[in-house]
Amino acid sequence: MNPVLFLAAALAGGVGAVLRYLVDLGVARLAGRRFPWGILLVNLSGSFVLGVVTTALPDAAFLLGAGLLGGYTTFSTAMLDTVALWRDGERPASVFNAVGMLLLGLLAAGLGLAVGALL
């Protein structure tokens, strides 16, 4: 792999992580912290954009997909939030966070692939 591309992807991952933090913080300010709406939005939007990038910009898929979107999206935080909801007695919210994020993420990725194919 080209070392410059590798470095650019690493830097893009850092940018993605900062964007994730800002989106999560902004959504939490609007919606509160009872449910992790910010992380849900991050993962769904990231799934959609990755679908678009994969089909419409295949040459940029590593930089944008593994780099920017790899830093932006987060499975680990989503699962930690799911466990925290369960622990706090928010069983329906916990199940929705796990199952809903998976199903909605698949839908978002599929829509992204379809949109990317049209571009």
Spans of model-derived segments:
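Membrane-interface helix-loop junctions in multi-pass transporters/channels
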Residues: 1-119
